[in-house]
């Protein structure tokens, strides 16, 4: 499978998705036809989100079609060479995708060769579940099971920073709480600006910040950038 899982879409001083364009170009391998899943967009319309994505990716030769605009979404997924899932609200993304019957067809198409690109909520959707999203508002998605394309949980926008005087939990503490109730999970803390590229069964972390792996009862482990690892059970 070919996956590009990004923590976020925008970096300080850069245009929207600018930092991701070289990564996307590197994984295209001749693919040009893309469907865009805009359902995570809450404060922008799906048309606006789709048009913005299409404009940014056009210089790479990618032809983007919003899945909400087609008469037969399942046929569009089957024909797509690239499936792009935008960030925003993970719960809304899951709810709309599930209600339209898109989850299994998307997963199947990626397993048969389509490139999957997702940022923030889109990275969450590639995981076994969406249980490591940060998002509010919460809507009922009728279940948390996601695409299960990547075998580990991802926490996008990961940071342990706390404002001075703030008494709430750090992000790591929240992840540790999850691992108490679900010790079978492994969670990747993916900071902003970072990503994971998957190809041929190998995952390669990248970005300017440290990516962390959390397991129940173990110390956090830093993933070395550009060092491939196999996240699938042996």
Swiss-Prot record:
The keyword Transmembrane does not apply. GO terms for cellular component: cytoplasm. Hydrolyzes dipeptides containing N-terminal aspartate residues. May play a role in allowing the cell to use peptide aspartate to spare carbon otherwise required for the synthesis of the aspartate family of amino acids. It catalyses: Dipeptidase E catalyzes the hydrolysis of dipeptides Asp-|-Xaa. It does not act on peptides with N-terminal Glu, Asn or Gln, nor does it cleave isoaspartyl peptides. Its EC number is 3.4.13.21. This is Peptidase E. The active site is at residues 120, 135, 157. CDD domains: GAT1_Peptidase_E. It is an enzyme of class 3 (hydrolase). GO terms for molecular function: dipeptidase activity; serine-type peptidase activity. InterPro entries: Class_I_gatase-like, Peptidase_S51, Peptidase_S51_dipeptidase-E.
